[in-house]
């Protein structure tokens, strides 16, 4: 949720953020109205309760002549308090709904606009000239790494098996990511992949995008699309110790996405699938440290991309393409030869205090006063990386060179066609 102090003191900042995202700025005015109504209702109910308490005390010391009128007054006040409390509950619910409807306020410098309005910050490496390149699925099938047909037979479209050295390649990639994280002070975690509704909502993944999330209705649990979700919930309703700097976690999990809005997109191969594996960095820090920590996450992502030896670029994602929780997001996109373009391999988001405010995660400032923490997240390795590895390292004879950093995990320097 956004900071109410900011909303009340400078609502135009929130309106501009909404416009940059392509969202309705009228939601800001609706929240201001709901906030005023809620505060008025609270004040009215408090005042009536105080009056009721005073009237009740007065009955005890009243004369027989005064008592009937005072009793009636106390009864009337009790009814007024009941009505005021009902109004307070209604205004609280309306306020919460209005508050939850507004996404995070973007940071200065984030490009306005939609999916195609990103800013390219850097291009790293030159795409290699490849005559008649094969796509990752053709390579994966010929090398015995990917089996889409049996994945579909078992689970339906957008499912797959990683087989043999394909499984080793992914496991090696994720182990490499986890090793990098641990070497940089992250605590490794294997979190639950099922979470309660309040945790999913707290991270900003419900609301307008609820249809993209798998839900187990009988158990009222959600399958996570990223380990960001359980790691954000890890310190819900807690005061964390940030006295020695940020808390950094690296979560390794399977991830599940319905891809409800992607019909017809990336139907071939493993670029867009319902289940994949990922190592995700997640950070709790003070709001003052958040922007510097965002740059650190990006640097660690770049270090991982250097390990797989592929050309990539870094983009500053436009406001309209940000998730509800993100105030700023950087994507690293790797070159995909058969598509002649760059595709996202990593993202890192600065969620400022948005998630922690929803999840009641705080820290103590220098004066010992509890304050809302900031949260950030960033991909360190995921299944989709195999697409870029296979396509960029393919050889004329149909083999694929294994990046040096992964050779020890896969057990060979070259993946050879089967049969």
Swiss-Prot record:
One of its GO terms (molecular function) is serine-tRNA ligase activity. GO terms for biological process: selenocysteine biosynthetic process; seryl-tRNA aminoacylation. InterPro entries: aa-tRNA-synt_IIb, aa-tRNA-synth_II, aa-tRNA-synth_II/BPL/LPL, Ser-tRNA-ligase_type_1, Ser-tRNA-synth_1_N, SerRS_1_N_sf, tRNA-bd_arm. The keyword Metal-binding does not apply. Pathway: Aminoacyl-tRNA biosynthesis; selenocysteinyl-tRNA(Sec) biosynthesis; L-seryl-tRNA(Sec) from L-serine and tRNA(Sec): step 1/1. Catalyzes the attachment of serine to tRNA(Ser). Is also able to aminoacylate tRNA(Sec) with serine, to form the misacylated tRNA L-seryl-tRNA(Sec), which will be further converted into selenocysteinyl-tRNA(Sec). SUPFAM superfamilies: Class II aaRS and biotin synthetases (SSF55681), tRNA-binding arm (SSF46589). This is Serine--tRNA ligase. ATP binds at residues 257-259, 273, 344-347. It is found in: Cytoplasm. Belongs to the class-II aminoacyl-tRNA synthetase family. Type-1 seryl-tRNA synthetase subfamily. Keywords: Aminoacyl-tRNA synthetase, ATP-binding, Cytoplasm, Ligase, Nucleotide-binding, Protein biosynthesis. The keyword Aminoacyl-tRNA synthetase applies. It comes from Mycobacterium marinum (strain ATCC BAA-535 / M). The lineage of its organism: Bacteria, Bacillati, Actinomycetota, Actinomycetes, Mycobacteriales. L-serine binds at residues 226-228, 280, 379. Consists of two distinct domains, a catalytic core and a N-terminal extension that is involved in tRNA binding.
């Amino acid at each position: 949720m956004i900071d109410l102090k900011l909303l009340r003191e400078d609502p135009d900042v929130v309106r501009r953020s909404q416009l940059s995202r392509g969202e309705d700025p009228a939601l800001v005015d609706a929240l201001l109205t709901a906030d005023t109504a809620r505060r008025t209702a609270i004040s009215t109910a408090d005042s009536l309760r105080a009056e009721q308490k005073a009237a009740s005390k007065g009955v005890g010391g009243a004369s027989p002549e005064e008592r009937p009128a005072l009793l009636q007054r106390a009864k009337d006040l009790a009814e007024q308090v009941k009505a005021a409390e009902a109004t307070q509950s209604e205004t609280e619910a309306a306020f919460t709904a209005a508050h939850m409807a507004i996404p995070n306020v973007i940071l200065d410098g984030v490009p306005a606009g939609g999916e195609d309005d990103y800013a390219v910050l850097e291009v790293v490496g030159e795409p290699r000239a490849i005559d008649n390149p094969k796509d990752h699925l053709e390579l994966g099938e010929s090398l015995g790494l990917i089996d889409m047909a049996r994945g579909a037979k078992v689970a339906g479209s957008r499912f797959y098996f990683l087989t043999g050295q394909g499984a080793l390649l992914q496991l090696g990639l994720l182990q490499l990511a986890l090793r990098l994280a641990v070497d940089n002070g992250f605590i490794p975690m294997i979190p639950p992949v099922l979470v309660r509704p309040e945790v999913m909502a707290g991270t900003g993944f419900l609301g307008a995008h609820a249809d993209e999330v798998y839900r187990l209705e009988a158990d009222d649990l959600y399958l996570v699309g990223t380990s960001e979700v359980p790691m954000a919930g890890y310190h819900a309703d807690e005061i964390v110790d940030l006295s020695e700097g940020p808390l950094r976690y690296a979560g390794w999990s399977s991830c599940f996405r319905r891809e409800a809005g992607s019909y017809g997109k990336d139907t071939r191969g493993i670029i867009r699938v319902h289940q994949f594996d990922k190592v995700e960095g997640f950070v709790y820090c003070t709001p003052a440290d958040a922007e510097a920590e965002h740059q650190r996450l990006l640097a660690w992502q770049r270090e991982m991309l250097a390990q797989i030896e592929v050309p990539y670029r870094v983009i500053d994602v436009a406001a309209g393409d940000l998730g509800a929780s993100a105030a700023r997001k950087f994507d690293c996109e790797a070159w995909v030869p058969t598509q002649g373009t760059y595709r996202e391999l990593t993202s890192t988001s600065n969620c400022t205090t948005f998630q922690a405010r929803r999840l009641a995660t705080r820290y103590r400032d220098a004066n010992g006063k509890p304050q809302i923490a900031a949260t950030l997240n960033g991909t360190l390795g995921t299944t989709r990386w195999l697409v870029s590895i296979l396509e960029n390292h393919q050889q004329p004879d149909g083999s694929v060179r294994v990046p040096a950093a992964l050779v020890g995990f896969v057990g060979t320097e070259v993946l050879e066609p089967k049969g």
